[in-house]
Each structure stands twice: as C-alpha cells, then as structure tokens.
C-alpha cells in the first residue's frame, strides 16, 4: 500500500490536569473534494500520481488505530464537490465513506453549500461525526440544531476542546444556497470559544479551519495573531501543502502551529503531540 501520511512530531507545553506527561496522536484531512479513487498514476507530478483514495485511507486508518486506539481524526471542510459521484449523489457517497473512517469532528467548507441548505441538513443528519463551526449564525435554519460551535473530547486523560471556523460566503457561494446564514468575524468568535473552553479546563484547544493560509480575507494567521489561548490550527481552503508546521505568534507571544495537507487527501496529516507538564 502506498503510504500517504505526512508525519510531524512536536513537543507541546501545557498546564496538564494530571501530573504525568501525555502523548496525543492527531490525523487530519482537508479539501478532499470527492476524490473517491486515487489520482491517475500517469500524472507528471510524481508527488501526486497514484496517491489518495478513500479505500486506502480507510485501510490506513485501521492500521493506525490498531497501533493507537486513542488517536483523533478531523476534517477541515470541502469534502464535497469534485467528482461525478458528488454531482449524482449529492454527498451521500462522501459522507458514507467518512462515516466508515470514524471522524471525531469536521468543519464546514464553502462547497458543502453547493446543493443548498436542505441538502446540507440531510447530509449532516447522516454523518456519524459532529460538525463544528463557531462563526456562522444558523438561526432560522435546521442547521442550528445540527452544527455546534465546539465539542470537548477526552483522550488518554486529556480534555481537548475543538472548534471550527469557516469562510465568508459572499462571493464564494450563491446567496440562494446559504440563505439566512450570517458570517461573523472569525477572530472575535474564536476568542469567545477559546475563553469558554479555557473555563471548562481544556488541556488543549484545536481549531479546525476552512479559512485558508496566506489567503485574501481573514486567514488562519490572522486568527492566531488576534487571539490568545489557541494551541493548534488544522487548516484547509487554500489547498496549501505544508511539509512542516508553520508558526504564528499569538497576542501573548506564544508560537501557535498550523498544518494543512493540500487537497484530494493525497496526504493525511499526522501530528504526534508530546504534552509536557509546565514546571
């Protein structure tokens, strides 16, 4: 099986609720864009040729979970749009396969709106994983009951807060497809959620973002630079291939890491966090 994991290991200092050091493994995808099968083996770009595909990812995840049952799996949005499967079945294939992968959470990309709100409601009800987005106001839609601003997960004795951020819809999505949904400032919303998660004594706070890296509009860099208390961003939207974590200084001067895996799930990001208790 061709491996499709980018592995990044880094040490993370935190005020752990327990005395001993901890380790946490995170796998993540973004902008898979309905890439059901591997890319063509005949592509000139050998870094992409014959990579990806849901069957491979499902098999790889089984292997990874056999080694580490406590791992976390996240998606940063735009699992929709990009193949005839999505055009014909409007997301049923993609969500069905994601269910087999047992995601812990996903956020919303702009292409999730491509068939309108009713289709999003149908798909999110089908998903066996939570959808998180903190900066959209879903008031007046059925999505208000289906999308949470954040979730709190527990792994290996750690309390992990996870929230989502999504891009401005105007100019990306036809107005009829998002209707009354209101986009709010991601920086303001992020800080509000971070404060709530800190108050709930989370050991680690992760943002799964579809804002984009080094992109026009509010980007992941701006969210990190304009907030305090965030620990890690798993990005999407800009289709950026990061071979190592990129760091941005937050309001307290702490360097916060960002990771992103390009598109089509050619790579699955793997982060191994060594959680060290602050002295």
Predicted region positions:
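Acidic, metal/ion-coordinating pockets
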Residues: 19-279
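Bacterial Sec-dependent N-terminal signal peptides
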Residues: 1-21
């Amino acid at each position: 099986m061709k491996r499709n994991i980018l592995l990044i290991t880094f040490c993370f200092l935190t005020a752990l609720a327990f005395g001993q050091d901890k380790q946490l493994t995170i796998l993540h995808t973004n902008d898979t864009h309905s890439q059901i099968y591997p890319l063509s083996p005949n592509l000139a770009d050998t870094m992409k040729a014959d990579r990806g595909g849901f069957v491979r990812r499902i098999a790889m995840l089984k292997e990874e979970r056999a080694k580490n049952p406590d791992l976390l799996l996240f998606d940063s949005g735009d699992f929709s749009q990009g193949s005839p499967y999505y055009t014909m079945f409007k997301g049923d294939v993609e969500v069905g396969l994601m269910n087999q992968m047992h995601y812990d959470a996903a956020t919303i990309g702009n292409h999730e709106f491509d068939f309108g709100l009713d289709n999003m409601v149908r798909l999110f009800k089908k998903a066996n994983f939570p959808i998180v987005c903190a900066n959209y106001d879903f008031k007046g839609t059925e999505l208000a009951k289906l999308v949470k601003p954040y979730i709190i997960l527990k792994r290996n004795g750690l309390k992990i807060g996870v929230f989502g951020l999504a891009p401005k819809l105007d100019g990306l999505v036809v107005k009829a497809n998002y209707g009354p949904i209101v986009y709010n400032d991601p920086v303001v919303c992020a800080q509000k959620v971070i404060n709530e998660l800190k108050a709930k004594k989370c050991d680690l706070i992760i943002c799964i973002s579809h804002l984009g890296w080094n992109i026009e509009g509010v980007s992941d860099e701006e969210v990190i630079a304009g907030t305090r208390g965030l620990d890690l961003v798993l990005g999407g939207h800009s289709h950026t291939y990061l071979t190592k974590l990129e760091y941005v200084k937050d309001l307290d001067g702490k360097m916060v890491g960002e990771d992103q895996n390009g598109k089509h799930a050619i790579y699955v990001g793997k982060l191994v966090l060594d959680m060290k208790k602050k002295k």
